[in-house]
Amino acid sequence: MEDFVRQCFNPMIVELTEKAMKEYGEDPKIETNKFAAICTHLEVCFMYSDFHFIDERSESIIVESGDPNALLKHRFEIIEGRDRTMAWTVVNSICNTTGVEKPKFIPDLYDYKENRFIEIGVTRREVHTYYLEKANKIKSEKTHIHIFSFTGEEMATKADYTLDEESRARIKTRLFTIRQEMASRGLWDSFRQSERGEETIEEKFEITGTMRRLADQSLPPNFSSLENFRAYVDGFEPNGCIEGKLSQMSKEVNARIEPFLKTTPRPLRLPDGPPCSQRSKFLLMDALKLSIEDPSHEGEGIPLYDAIKCMKTFFGWKEPNIVKPHKKGINPNYLLAWKQVLAELQDIENEEKIPKTKNMKKTGQLKWALGENMAPEKVDFEDCKDVSDLRQYDSDEPESRSLASWIQSEFNKACELTDSSWIELDEIGEDVAPIEHIASMRRNYFTAEVSHCRATEYIMKGVYINTALLNASCAAMDDFQLIPMISKCRTKEGRRKTNLYGFIIKGRSHLRNDTDVVNFVSMEFSLTDPRLEPHKWEKYCVLEIGDMLLRTAVGQVSRPMFLYVRTNGTSKIKMKWGMEMRRCLLQSLQQIESMIEAESSVKEKDMTKEFFENKSETWPIGESPKGVEEGSIGKVCRTLLAKSVFNSLYASPQLEGFSAESRKLLLIAQALRDNLEPGTFDLGGLYEAIEECLINDPWVLLNASWFNSFLAHALK
């Protein structure tokens, strides 16, 4: 290969390349593929600039041979091929004279006509892949990227190829010739396979001063200095016999490695006890909306105005009564609270001008429901540190609950399609990086699959409620503000629709710390009769408040309308995360992207289109007692989204612990499935760590039961 490079390339290029490699401590005689790659890249940069000039009128022209005295300036400044110091000097002087933003990495060329730096890439792989790597590495809008491949493909930022067809054809022809010359000498395969991704050079990082002293103090025992410890870590071979490694780490550790076989794992033990209950901050599948289409009333967009308008669409109100009391609460207070909301809404309507916000009267029932004056008085620690029997008051262990079928139904519902669209196409954010085309295409396909999904409705509902509650908590700290629970969507025909799910009344909210709690009472409409699954509604008092006429196949039927009322609480940090629930869209899009990337790398081309448009193919969605469930790509998108949304709606310490610990067991089981002969020590301890998170949380219990299905099928 070295001989080929010296024959094939201009001696000046070879010399510059040797100099550059030596600057980075690389030997052209040993790293021959790299030698060839750098020469090729340098030659492409030179060819890119050849014959391109700017005349006295600042027009760009091509001159192959002409009057040597013409006042022509080179269109491109060549930066590649200079030593680092010189290259940075050139870049800095260009930035100073033109005002262009200074790049983070040394680019290859500067274009005086377009006033931009250019990064040239020459790849033996797929142009898209290399383009993405370049874009990710330089992370700059301003630097233009132009990638050529040895197969004649090219890709450039915003499909703006800078040069005319003919100049680019010269470059492509030259690359093709190099490839053929290599192939005829049997060098091409090794050259093609040797391409590494873009590497970013790590800076040497010195620690000095206080940090250095802290580092020396915090070393593990038996190490005298940071250098000493670093040398040990660098020399630590991660593969090899684990027992030996453990004894090398510490004399006290001894671990017997047990082989992990198909018969080793047992199912997770799910807790016994009464069935678990609903604990989300708002109703999910059981929610009922009062809606207005094409809202155009006065004050449209002001929540209170929208809510009153929605309330007026319903005519079946009746005297409310309790149909499912709350076991521990003073139920008549919940009833009075609803009556108070109706009365105060009526009062608003009788006023001349409807106010933008409504603060409820501080009645006995609301004070009770919002826990006013219930919190023990806070005493400064200084005043009581001398009390002899000072202790934290006892709190009961949480009561164990068993898995109930309702949570699986909730999840199934969240994966379904509704007949409305809950996000616009651009909800997942505009393109920022220059990976425009593929990224937009994936985003648009994905959005089309999930925009009508019920989980997306939950996202928008969660964002709305948390935003409104956080705003009110800061703006009206002492007031019992009435907050309508609203969402907006578009119907199949594209008409706008505003929906009211019910109301929240916020308690006092002097939130100093992130974890300080604000209490609220939620009142939500529903057609679900709570007596069908009373265990699900343990935390609610449910009223019957009206009758609703529903259109069915057999004509109109009247169904009782219920109001689910409960006391609840949240904190600044929880509301902050609730406001950011749109991240779930991004998380599930990234999971889908990694599936597409895997497909694409097998097929060696971007598979986005085929992935979403091949309707006949099915994909694994999850495990159930019946086996591996499969479904269309849309179903996969919606299932991943629903999982992400439920992780947000049912976030809890139990979920954090379960996810972290069960993942370890999952990886071991997958290693066994891939015939990697995994070994474990203290498997009992791992089971204990997982099972201590299985207490009473419905979403965690459901995940644990899915995990058991996975274990059963994975290890058959």
UniProtKB/Swiss-Prot annotation:
Phosphorylated on serines and threonines by host kinases, including human casein kinase II. Its main location: host cell. One of its GO terms (biological process) is viral translational frameshifting. The keyword ATP-binding does not apply. The keyword Calcium does not apply. Its cofactor is Mn(2+). Binds 2 manganese ions per subunit. GO terms for molecular function: endonuclease activity; metal ion binding; RNA binding. Disulfide bonds: none annotated. It is found in: Host cytoplasm; Host nucleus. Mn(2+) 2 binds at E80, D108. Belongs to the influenza viruses PA family. Influenza RNA polymerase is composed of three subunits: PB1, PB2 and PA. Interacts (via C-terminus) with PB1 (via N-terminus). This is Polymerase acidic protein. It comes from Influenza A virus (strain A/Chicken/Hong Kong/96.1/2002 H5N1 genotype Y). The lineage of its organism: Viruses, Riboviria, Orthornavirae, Negarnaviricota, Polyploviricotina.
